[in-house]
Swiss-Prot record:
Protein name, per record: SsrA-binding protein
Compositionally biased intervals (Basic and acidic residues): 139-158
NCBIfam families registered for this protein in UniProt: PRK05422.1 (NF003843), smpB (TIGR00086)
Xref: PROSITE patterns: SSRP (PS01317)
SUPFAM superfamilies: Small protein B (SmpB)
CC per GO annotation: cytosol
Keyword field contains Signal: no
Pfam families: SmpB
Gene name of the record: smpB
């Protein structure tokens, strides 16, 4: 007896599940364009990611010889990892993008001074995808302004809720 497909799968919708987020990227950079990239991973890395042992906070993407690599992201191997391979937690991982996207990113990084920052790692139909963003660094006063704006929005919502409740 076969299982009935769920409503989401029957309609062709792709289910995504977030593995890791880089919240610090939103705080430290002005994020502009976002790209979805595949990752060239080894078997032990997939198992470790399924166990939730990935961290992209310290990672960044780097263009080397016309290809983009993820550097500094950590995937901690499981204890049961294979004995015939030596797992390296912070190895360089190749990002899989279309050639046109790579060329576009390459020109923006080299000429305009942008940085490639990983923002999210997630599952997309049984494949691990990485969202990378073209970003420019924030100055300290920009970070303070963003914090003030966030506090003001929170206070404004609080006042509106209180006013609507009293009315």
């Amino acid at each position: 007896m076969s299982k009935k497909p769920t409503k989401d799968k029957a309609n062709g919708a792709k289910a995504t599940k977030t593995i890791a987020l880089n919240k610090r990227a939103r705080h430290e950079y002005h994020l502009e364009e976002r790209y979805e990239a595949g990752l060239a991973l080894q078997g032990w890395e997939i198992k470790a990611i399924r166990a939730g042992r990935a961290n992209i906070v310290d990672g960044y993407a780097y263009v080397r010889s016309g290809e983009i690599y993820l550097i500094g992201a950590q995937i901690t191997p499981l204890i049961q990892a294979s004995t015939h391979t030596v797992p390296v937690e912070r190895r360089d991982r190749k990002l899989l993008l279309h050639r046109a996207e790579i060329d576009k990113v390459l020109t923006r990084v080299e000429r305009e001074g942008y940085t490639l920052v990983p923002t999210a790692l997630y599952w997309s139909s049984n494949k691990v995808k990485l969202e990378i963003a073209l970003a420019k660094g924030k100055q300290n006063h920009d970070k303070r302004d963003a914090a003030k704006e966030r506090d003001w929005q929170r206070d404004k919502q609080r006042v509106m809720r209180r006013h609507n409740r009293d009315a």
